[in-house]
């Protein structure tokens, strides 16, 4: 949620942000109209209530011949108070509805445009020339099947499309990757949290995911009302809902480990083979509460953490600055790290890190104590540190001519010292 005082004073800034996102500019005027109506209705209610109280005091002191008149006025005012209260409640509801529809203000540095208008900030690593090595690379699913590590057929049999089993060394590879991510996060002062994967509607709404991503989210049927999370960001944001945090010693940093669930409602026909786009996956997510003035610097730290992990798994990647029209409603700015996938001949997203400024904190009422003794919303940030999709890039970029997969050096201690995953027959 945005600061209404800022909207009143700088409506053109908010309108420009909405324009860059490709969202309704008129919504800003709707918010301002609703705000004016809310304040006007509330003022009428408060004035009528004050008159009602004053006359109530006069009734107690009035002479018998005046008391009847005052009581009649009190009854008339009671009806007015009730009417003004109803108007104020309606106006406040309209204001709240409009305010919650507004997306975060895009940072000026974010590129303009849509999904394809990102800016490449840098490319890191050498793309392998498989032709020079004398063999055609296999895709991650073929490799996973040949080492008896990815079983899509049985995943579909058990749960439907876009489900899978990870088995054997590929399952261990995922655990190794996620554990390595946790170790790295803890070395940098992050607190490990294994988070709930079901959250209340208020928490899902507070993080902004019901604005632009509602169709991607699984929801339980009645009588239950919870949502399945697509990232532990949601639970980590909700963890400090309605709290006042002490950030005097620096940001509060978490890394959350959880299973994640996404409907992929808009992905019909996309990435139907393999584990690039699936309904369930595991992820280690970084989440930070920081002072607003420190959020940009903290954003760069999260990006550096992601690049540190990518260096450990030894895959070529690029960093992009996401365009305003491709930002989620909560993000003011977002950087993605995309790894090279040899068989697709293109980069695919592995991580994203977003600076959500004070947007989520206002919606969830998460504040810090400030110098004058009052409170102010904190800034929140998030970033992916490892997830199931990384296996795609690891398998394809580390494959050998004989179908084996060389395990990245940094991951070997987490694999019991194993250096290579060899092709093998399915045991069952």
Swiss-Prot record:
Q: In which pathway does it act?
A: Aminoacyl-tRNA biosynthesis; selenocysteinyl-tRNA(Sec) biosynthesis; L-seryl-tRNA(Sec) from L-serine and tRNA(Sec): step 1/1
The protein's role, per its UniProt record: Catalyzes the attachment of serine to tRNA(Ser). Is also able to aminoacylate tRNA(Sec) with serine, to form the misacylated tRNA L-seryl-tRNA(Sec), which will be further converted into selenocysteinyl-tRNA(Sec).
Q: Which UniProt keywords apply?
A: Aminoacyl-tRNA synthetase, ATP-binding, Cytoplasm, Ligase, Nucleotide-binding, Protein biosynthesis
Where is this protein found? Cytoplasm
Residues noted as binding L-serine in the record, renumbered to the chain: 231-233, 285, 384
Catalytic reactions of this protein: tRNA(Ser) + L-serine + ATP = L-seryl-tRNA(Ser) + AMP + diphosphate + H(+); tRNA(Sec) + L-serine + ATP = L-seryl-tRNA(Sec) + AMP + diphosphate + H(+)
Entry note about domains = Consists of two distinct domains, a catalytic core and a N-terminal extension that is involved in tRNA binding.
Classification via Pfam families:
Seryl_tRNA_N, tRNA-synt_2b
Organism phylogeny = Bacteria, Bacillati, Actinomycetota, Actinomycetes, Bifidobacteriales
Name by which UniProt lists this protein: Serine--tRNA ligase
Q: Which residues bind ATP?
A: 262-264, 278, 349-352
Q: What is its EC number?
A: 6.1.1.11
- Which domain of life does the UniProt lineage start with? Bacteria
Organism, by scientific name, is: Bifidobacterium animalis subsp. lactis (strain AD011)
Gene name?
serS
């Amino acid at each position: 949620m945005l600061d209404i005082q800022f909207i009143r004073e700088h409506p053109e800034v908010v309108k420009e942000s909405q324009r860059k996102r490709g969202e309704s500019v008129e919504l800003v005027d709707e918010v301002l109209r609703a705000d004016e109506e809310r304040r006007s209705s509330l003022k009428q209610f408060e004035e009528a209530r004050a008159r009602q109280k004053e006359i109530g005091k006069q009734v107690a002191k009035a002479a018998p011949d005046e008391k009847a008149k005052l009581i009649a006025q009190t009854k008339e005012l009671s009806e007015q108070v009730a009417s003004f209260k109803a108007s104020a409640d309606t106006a406040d509801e309209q204001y709240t509805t409009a305010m919650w529809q507004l997306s975060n203000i895009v940072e000026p540095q974010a590129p303009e445009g849509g999904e394809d208008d990102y800016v490449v900030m840098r490319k890191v690593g050498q793309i392998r020339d498989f032709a020079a090595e004398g063999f055609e690379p296999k895709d991650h699913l073929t490799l996973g099947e040949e080492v008896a590590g990815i079983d899509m057929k049985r995943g579909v049999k058990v749960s439907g499309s876009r489900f899978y089993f990870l088995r054997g060394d590929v399952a261990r590879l995922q655990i190794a990757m996620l554990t390595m991510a946790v170790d790295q996060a803890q070395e940098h002062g992050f607190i490990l949290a294994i988070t709930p994967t079901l959250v209340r509607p208020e928490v899902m709404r507070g993080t902004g995911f019901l604005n632009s991503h509602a169709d991607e989210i699984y929801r339980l049927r009645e009588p239950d009302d919870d949502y399945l999370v697509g990232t532990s960001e949601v639970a980590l944001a909700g963890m400090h809902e309605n709290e006042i945090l002490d950030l005097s010693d620096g940001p509060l940093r978490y890394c959350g480990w959880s299973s994640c669930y996404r409907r992929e409602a808009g992905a019909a026909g996309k990435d139907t083979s393999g584990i690039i786009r699936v309904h369930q996956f595991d992820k280690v997510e970084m989440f930070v509460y920081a002072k607003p003035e420190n959020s940009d610097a903290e954003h760069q730290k999260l990006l550096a953490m992601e690049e540190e992990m990518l260096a450990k798994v030894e895959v070529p990647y690029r960093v992009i600055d996401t365009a305003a029209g491709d930002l989620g409603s909560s993000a003011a700015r977002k950087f993605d790290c995309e790894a090279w996938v040899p068989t697709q001949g293109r980069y695919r997203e592995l991580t994203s890190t977003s600076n959500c400024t004070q947007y989520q904190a206002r919606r969830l009422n998460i504040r810090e104590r400030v110098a004058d003794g009052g409170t102010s919303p904190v800034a929140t940030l998030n970033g992916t540190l490892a997830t199931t999709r990384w296996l795609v890039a690891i398998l394809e970029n580390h494959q050998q001519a004989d179908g084996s997969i060389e395990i990245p050096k940094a991951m070997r201690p987490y694999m019991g010292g194993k250096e290579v995953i060899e092709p093998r027959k399915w045991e069952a």
